[in-house]
Amino acid sequence: MKLDYNSREIFFGNEALIVADMTKGSNGKPEFTNHKIVTGLVSVGSMEDQAETNSYPADDVPDHGVKKGATLLQGEMVFIQTDQALKEDILGQQRTENGLGWSPTGNWKTKCVQYLIKGRKRDKVTGEFVDGYRVVVYPHLTPTAEATKESETDSVDGVDPIQWTLAVQATDSDIYSNGGKKVPAIEYEIWGEQAKDFAKKMESGLFIMQPDTVLAGAITLVAPVIPNVTTATKGNNDGTIVVPATLKDSKGGTIKVTSVIKDAHGKVATNGQLAPGVYIVTFSADGYEDVTAGVSVTDHS
């Protein structure tokens, strides 16, 4: 059968676990400080949502109303070593006077946590393999217990290295949001040139990915050229401009868009009721930066 599948993707291998403190900046957006990389991440267990979903029956409908509790993701992280960043910055442990030991305090730290999963996909058009990353961000992650471990005596069969298992939970963040909505987790996928730019930025200085982070090589919308028009009748506010419902992106794809028309003062205007003047049309689509196009309306002669 000839079916139009998407590009085929696989993900494998965790790396670059970063923890950071997050505060709200003066512009309301997250600001990150005290970035540290944690060495020795082996795996991240399933972060399951513990919130209950309840259906309330009425009449002859079993789900007259449905309510979901607050999101609480719980899971675990496994490490093959526990370095200072893990002990101090996540578990809140206290270092001994001689600098050789650590003791638990129960004062677990809440951090913004990010890690990468390597990926590879085969482009559906060219057939080429493209490398990339899945970037996983938990804006508000906290341990729920001290890290546990098991050790065994060496034998003729050898012995496995000790692994530490850390129980964690993630909740909504009041600061880190997507489209104005609070989120307990976000996963980004970056490929090709964007992945290369991401790695370059990360190597020059640790950072946390955000919904508005711009990377070089992004696929963008191509702004249209909107023809100038005149009003339908002289002296009336009845101008109509041609506003496309789809735009091309920088790779030639056709993308459905929404649009908003604003006058020179930034006030939203209604197509078909446009007065003579200059207007800016803003086009939006999920996964793309907005683009704008200018157009003028003149009075009918």
From Swiss-Prot:
Its main location: virion. It comes from the Viruses. Keywords: Viral genome ejection through host cell envelope, Viral long flexible tail ejection system, Viral penetration into host cytoplasm, Viral tail protein, Viral tail tube protein, Virion, Virus entry into host cell. InterPro entries: L_lac_phage_MSP, L_lac_phage_MSP_N, Phage_tube_C. GO terms for biological process: symbiont genome ejection through host cell envelope, long flexible tail mechanism. It is found in: Virion. Belongs to the skunalikevirus tail tube protein family. Homohexamer. Interacts with the tail terminator protein. Forms the cylindrical rigid tail tube with a 4 nm wide central channel for DNA ejection. The tube is composed of 31 hexameric rings. This is Tail tube protein.
